[in-house]
Design a protein with these regions (language model features):
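Active-site substrate-recognition segment that forms the wall
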Residues: 5-6, 37, 69-71, 182-187, ...
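Short beta-strand to alpha-helix junction loop
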Residues: 44-55, 79-88, 126-144, 154, ...
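Dinucleotide-binding Rossmann-like beta1-alpha1 core, especially the glycine-rich loop
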Residues: 35-111, 121, 246-247
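Gly/Ala-rich phosphate-binding loop of Rossmann-like dinucleotide-binding domains
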Residues: 4, 8, 145
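Glycine-rich phosphate/pyrophosphate-binding beta-alpha loops
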Residues: 42, 130-132, 240-244, 332-344
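C-terminal lid/capping helical subdomain adjacent to the catalytic/cofactor pocket in oxidative enzymes
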Residues: 9, 23, 315-356
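Helical element adjacent to the flavin cofactor pocket in flavoenzyme catalytic cores
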Residues: 125-187, 198, 346
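Glycine-rich FAD pyrophosphate-binding loop
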Residues: 8-32
Length: 356
């Protein structure tokens, strides 16, 4: 949606059509997440995930202020609960400093107690530029603005084939009634989320050889009893693991509290939360949120991340690639856009515009 809004502004007079197989925007990864505005702490400074996040953070706050998109700059605490995590936290701090993250600082256990009296950490890392956003209202803004400039939102429309032609691409689509038709376009932007590898494959790219294969990774959330509302005022994270940032205290704009997400690789797309995970969530979260009791947690929601690597494989960056060198001029692939995809939506849109 951010790409459509950007191009509707910079390429006025060109016909832009958004093809979406669901009956509205944001039915998958874009809405099923923690809705966090990240600051760019974790990853190496030369990665797209870092550079786009560092630039995207202030841009997104500015858009929210200007356009009235609900958000809150809560700040974020990453907590170390043992000595080994303290060493790991030092590494995150040093990386964040290299990345140029504004206001980042190490905090002591006493400072943690002052900032978040119901949380526990031997020490921590405080990021004042992290926050939360209403992702639905953000996407609604993108939709409304793009449509006001003439963009067509073709909901209930699934891409079933994509073929290079002399002048661009022939895109075969199917609607909810099963009717099929073909569109011709000079440019195709593949931002299909969990299905981006399938679109790339349709275009003739060997997704396994080129590293475009997506491995769905499920993240589940458990809600916290309303009796604890107000006990957490910031995003509170554990020191992260190797494949994700860790199940953390997720705040909503109305101050409801959730714990999540975990990270479970799956073969099928299902958004059902496994109730048997309650004890694991509880045992992990209670290390840094000691006020929790097992009965405080209830299954809430789940999302699926489009990861580019399997469990145990090396970390992979976003793929944002114009495919002219493969003989596919005018095709831009956005593959593996997981966290911090929400924070980087504006800078990803800028990058796509630049590539075109």
């Amino acid at each position: 949606m951010a790409v459509a809004e950007r191009l509707s502004r910079t390429r006025r007079g060109q016909e832009i059509v958004v093809l979406e197989r669901h009956d509205g925007f944001g039915r998958e990864t874009s809405s099923r997440n923690s809705e966090v505005i990240h600051a760019g702490l974790y990853y190496a400074q030369d990665l797209l995930k870092t550079t786009l996040c560092i630039r995207g953070n202030p841009m997104l706050y500015e858009l929210c202020r200007k356009e009235g998109v609900p958000h809150r700059k809560t700040g974020k605490l990453i907590l170390a609960t043992d000595k080994s995590e303290e060493q790991q936290l030092q590494g995150i701090f040093e990386q964040a400093e290299k990345n140029g993250v504004a206001g980042i600082r190490l905090v002591s256990g006493k400072e943690i107690e002052a900032l978040e009296p119901y949380s526990f950490g031997l020490s921590g890392l405080y990021s004042p530029e992290s926050g939360i956003i209403d992702s639905h209202q953000l996407m609604k803004y993108f939709e409304h603005t793009a449509e006001s400039r003439g963009t067509t939102m073709a909901y209930g429309t699934e891409v079933i084939a994509l073929e290079k032609s002399v002048d661009g691409y022939v895109v075969e689509i199917k609607d909810t009634d099963g009717e099929q038709l073909q569109l011709e376009s000079a440019v195709v932007i593949n931002s299909a989320g969990l299905w981006a590898d399938r679109i790339a494959w349709m275009a003739g790219i060997d997704v396994d050889k080129e590293g475009y294969r997506i491995y769905p990774c499920k993240g589940e959330y458990f809600s916290v009893s309303s009796r604890h509302q107000g006990k957490v005022g910031r995003l509170v994270y554990p020191t992260p693991s190797t494949i994700h940032l860790g199940a953390h205290a997720v705040l909503s704009l109305d101050d409801r509290l959730k714990i999540g997400p975990n990270a479970v690789y799956v073969d099928e797309i299902s958004y059902q939360v496994d109730e048997d995970g309650q004890e694991e969530f509880y045992s992990k979260a209670r290390r840094f949120l000691p006020f929790l009791e097992l009965e405080d947690l209830a299954p809430d929601m789940a999302g699926i991340r489009p990861k580019l690597y399997r469990k145990g494989e090396p970390f992979r960056d976003f793929i944002i690639q114009e495919e002219g060198e493969r003989g596919l001029s005018g095709l831009v692939n956005l593959v593996g856009i997981e966290s911090p995809g929400l924070t980087t939506c504006l800078t990803i849109a800028e990058e796509v515009d630049r590539l075109l």
